[in-house]
Amino acid sequence: MRPIAKFTNGLTTLPSGLKFALGLLFFMALSFIQSEAAEGQLGGCPCGCSGGCRFSGAGTSDEIDSRIGSRWNFTATDGATTGAGDAVTLTWGIAAEGSPIGDAFGANTGPEGSSFVDFLDNATARDPNSTGGADLTQRDWFSLFEDSANRISQVSGVTFNFESNDDGAPLFSAPAGGGLLAGPAGALGTRADIRIGGRSVDGQTGGNVLAFAFPANIGETVFDTDNVNFFSSTFNDSVGFRNVLTHELFHALGISHVDSAGGASFLLNPTINTSFDGPQLDDILVLQRNYGDFLESSNDQLGNNSIATATVLGLLSDDNSLSAGQEVDDTVIGFDEVGFVSINDATDVDVFEFSLSELSEVSIDLSPEGASYLQGVENGTLEEIDTLELNDLALQLFDSDGNLIAAADDFGLGLSESILQTLDAGTFFVEVSGSSDEIQLFTLGLSSSVVAVPEPGSVMIVVGMFGFLQVRRRRN
């Protein structure tokens, strides 16, 4: 069996993957590697060439789609799931100490029992009093796992729940005949969908493997417990450990590596980077393409695709504007940035509800969000993708009975749409849609100003004067 990683020119690169045997099906195993470059820096040209990288013309979300190898179609919580762009609920857990882990790298070391909890207690625990005991949630390092899982849920339709039970079943085995054999599927109260363990892999000197994971519907994730020096760093709240973990969870969700250049760096780059914290723009796009935005997990995973399940924005007034989405003007995304929403394709709609307490002039503005950068599949050709111009968005306004009041679809890719409408008190709905099979991040903003209504006495005076003038005209 071919190793999952190989080293060239002092840097670590990955082949296309390793064979994973499951009946007659083969899956790609994905690994995360550490460069010999300084912490926080990428090692070498992201596309793997020593000189200039090969670039070509403008890309579309085909470049995003090409990195989605699979998605979870059955989970312990949901049972059978639906299609791309829809939300899922997954359990994650720590494999019981001693759970067998096969030799994925052909080092002829044979299976080894997981020693991940012991490794975490000794390498990553920042409070020595937090170790020990059966309740892993009391460990000091447990918050690192929660932070990574919660961050994915904040920026996508994936809901992660911790499964505290684990029966010690093998994560995977490596039969003598070759290939790798998956362990059992997740089961509530027994084991998680995504089980995380650790064993010795290839040491911690030079370019080496930090962790690897199997794709969706398998999801087993293994950390190299040799890498004590790297994982013991508490720099920026252990960002190195958290970025590796979040990266591997992306693989467990069916998403593969991305190469990038021109100043754009992403969590799914093949080499570790601690200069940012968590998923970046391209990571969020590919994750939402596969599982939708966080609003898709609302209403028991029905999302906000109809008036009946609309996202309630609240009362719109002079001193209370409303909004949805997060502005994007760069590939860099801060760990505290939340609220990213998107239209997934031509069949996806997002519906938002707002209300008015008095006659008002309402302004509704819809803007696509994104940035331009170079990216491509690992070791492939890099293409420029402008994520501001992936899908042409449209805007519609409905009353409480679902009757269309106004619509805006006047401009093209990358341009905003707006509606200006005088509305009486009541409840209204805004629908956002797209025209093509592309993902598009967007922001929606609503503002209003009260329309002054004349006092009854003033109206009577005006009407009286008008009647007097009419009489005078008749007499003339």
Protein language model annotation of sequence segments:
Residues 223, 362-366, 428-434:
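Extracellular beta-strand-rich recognition modules
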Residues 322-363, 371-378, 414-419, 427-429:
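Non-catalytic, beta-strand-enriched accessory regions in extracellular/secretory proteins
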